[in-house]
Curated annotation (Swiss-Prot):
Compartments where found: Cell membrane
Record GO terms (molecular function): 4-hydroxybutyrate receptor activity; riboflavin transmembrane transporter activity
Organism listed in the record: Mus musculus (Mouse)
UniProt name for this protein: Solute carrier family 52, riboflavin transporter, member 2
Biased composition (Low complexity): 227-236
Highest taxon in the source lineage: Eukaryota
Gene symbol of the encoding locus: Slc52a2
Length: 450
């Protein structure tokens, strides 16, 4: 088969990356904006815990997609993808206008609009794992890396935007007290605003999601339909049942090939690589679930408690740079992919050690070690970045290894991601938001005797 035109190939990779960008851009954008909104919403330091649970409850999107596939067999995968993209665009647009609206619930103020829209966006993002990834099974395996690069952009672009926005500044001013008893002077916190508001941030996020939806439409126009005849020379054929075995040989993933393999010499496929329920695949899926339980449930719920004692800047940098570690891990996986199960387990152990340190800081809040020092700020930010980068690399490596199992393996990977995230978030909600195991500090109040 003739080589595909370079321009068409590059354009397809670009569209796949932009398509992947829309999968988690909404939730990632909300996460990196937490340091800005947490000081204005009534939930305070517990807001990340609420958000973790809402993202976990977004797994209902997985059930809705499953129900759609059973009730609408043969309808294709385009409809759920378009619904997911539509929810993302409308949800972030409403969030830009309503994020700071507060309403009383059981006599207490809650950011009802923010939490409700966050749940809607979580539904869309969770559903994307079982709609976007299976759609890629129709494409040659190299495009999977472009998709994960796009998912990295869904974290990187909101991070760049958040870095430009800044986190604002807090100053503690001594002002005369308005009371007859007690000290005549009291310390009052003064908040200085960011470079642009959270409203502007969410509008830009809406534009990014619109770009992703447009890329998907462009991808559908560029690629042949599953019922059309394969076009010689495009190299971008959509799989059909009659050509599955032939394409499996022609499009073997470079992530699975030995370094010495050259064009025209295709090794026999390993039968074990296509056994979804083999012991190796089960271990990979289990590791993927555990990794996502930590990164999407356990650790995000306590991030504010581990960082805010060191200041808003520490929290801002930990959230933003930690999210930037995701696309960097994708780039690293494109260059060096760990195919060893033992190696991935070793990396998981390293990530768990870093996570244990961060959990310890959260448990000691509001007076963790090195609070009030530059060393403490550097250490907590660096720990978050390394922890996020390590786990992100593991997730990309496992998903790439499972790609050889085809659409069922990628669907199982999406389920493992969501189940792990759900268990992690549900486990952390009671200690953070009900029993108040983790304590929050107060602005301009020294609770550590420094």
């Amino acid at each position: 088969m003739a080589a595909p035109p370079l321009g068409r190939l590059v354009l397809t990779h670009l569209l796949v990356a932009l398509f992947g960008m829309g999968s988690w851009a909404a939730v990632n954008g909300i996460w990196v904006e937490l340091p800005v909104v947490v000081k204005e919403l009534p939930e305070g330091w517990s807001l990340p815990s609420y958000l973790s649970v809402l993202v976990a409850l977004g797994n209902l999107g997985l059930l809705l997609v499953t129900l759609w596939r059973r009730l609408a067999r043969g309808k294709g995968e385009q409809v759920p993808i378009r619904v997911v993209q539509g929810l993302g665009i409308v949800g972030t647009g409403l969030l830009a206008s309503l994020w700071n609206h507060v309403a009383p619930v059981a006599g207490k103020p809650y950011s009802v609009a923010f939490l409700t829209l966050a749940f809607v966006l979580a539904l869309a993002c969770c559903a994307s794992n079982v709609t976007f990834l299976p759609f890629l099974s129709h494409l040659p395996p190299p495009f999977l890396r472009s998709f994960f690069l796009g998912q990295g952009l869904s974290a990187l672009l909101p991070c760049v935007l958040a870095l430009g926005q800044g986190v604002g500044r807090l100053e503690c001013l001594h002002v005369p007290a308005n009371r007859t008893t007690g000290p005549p002077i009291e310390v009052s916190p003064i908040n200085f605003p960011e470079r642009f508001s959270a409203t502007t941030f969410f509008w830009v996020l809406t534009a990014l999601l619109g770009t992703s939806a447009a890329a998907f439409q462009g991808l559908l126009l560029l690629l042949p339909s599953p019922t059309s005849e394969p076009t010689t020379g495009t190299g971008l054929r959509v799989e059909t049942p009659g050509t599955e075995e032939e394409e499996e040989e022609e499009e073997a993933s470079p992530l699975q090939e030995p370094p010495g393999q050259v064009a025209g010499i295709v090794s026999s496929p390993d039968p074990k690589a296509h056994q979804l329920f083999s012991s190796r695949s089960a271990c990979l899926l289990g590791l993927l679930a555990i990794t996502n339980a930590l990164t999407n449930g356990v650790l995000p719920a306590v991030q504010s408690f581990s960082c805010l004692p060191y200041g808003r800047l520490a929290y801002h940098l930990a959230v933003v740079l930690g999210s930037c570690a995701n696309p960097l891990a994708c780039f690293l996986a494109m260059a060096v992919l760990c195919r060893s199960l033992a190696g991935l387990c070793g990396l998981s152990l390293l990530g768990m050690l870093l996570g244990s340190y961060l959990m310890t800081l959260a448990a000691l809040s509001p007076c963790p070690p090195l609070v009030g020092t530059s060393a403490g700020v550097v250490l907590v930010v660096l720990s978050w970045v390394l922890c996020a980068g390590t786990f992100s690399y593991i997730k990309v490596a496992i998903s790439s290894m499972l790609h050889s199992g085809g659409r069922p393996a990628l669907l199982a990977a999406g389920v493992a991601i969501q189940v792990g995230s759900l268990l992690g978030a549900v486990a952390m909600f009671p200690p953070t938001s009900i029993y108040r195991v983790f304590r929050s500090g107060k602005d301009c109040v020294d609770q550590c005797g420094l």
